Amino acid sequence: MIKKLDRNKARRKRQLRVRKTVHGTPERPRLNVFRSNQNIYAQIIDDTVGRTLVSASTLDPEVRSRLQGSGGNKAAAAIVGEVVAKRALAAGVTKVVFDRAGYLYHGRVAALAEAAREAGLEF
């Protein structure tokens, strides 16, 4: 019997519980965050049609050129937040619903959110 806590399984349960109430609409799409050890990804999603409007990650050339070191730190997350906000504003999206996907609002997730707010997204 496995007694050690599977962190990703627990995160997934939190994510599914929150996703019952958090939905993106055309007026306020959902800003979703995915965090891996080496990278961070952000998508703005309209859940009514199931379509990603804009996205950014540490793998994008625009972000990668501004990175110094790893893509798995708070500085990289802040750059991704700024880039996704600029792309969203260019696509006509100003207000979003933040979906932290079961991650704690701390560290890289918080850095991405704060940078997106400073760049002009409202949530």
From Swiss-Prot:
CDD domains recorded: Ribosomal_L18_L5e (cd00432)
Family under the similarity heading: Belongs to the universal ribosomal protein uL18 family.
SUPFAM superfamilies per record: Translational machinery components
NCBIfam families hit by this protein: L18_bact
Gene3D superfamilies: 3.30.420.100
Pfam family, any one: Ribosomal_L18p
Oligomeric form and interacting partners: Part of the 50S ribosomal subunit; part of the 5S rRNA/L5/L18/L25 subcomplex. Contacts the 5S and 23S rRNAs.
Gene: rplR
GO biological process: translation
Provenance organism: Symbiobacterium thermophilum (strain DSM 24528 / JCM 14929 / IAM 14863 / T)
Full protein name: Large ribosomal subunit protein uL18
Alphabetized UniProt keyword annotations: Ribonucleoprotein, Ribosomal protein, RNA-binding, rRNA-binding
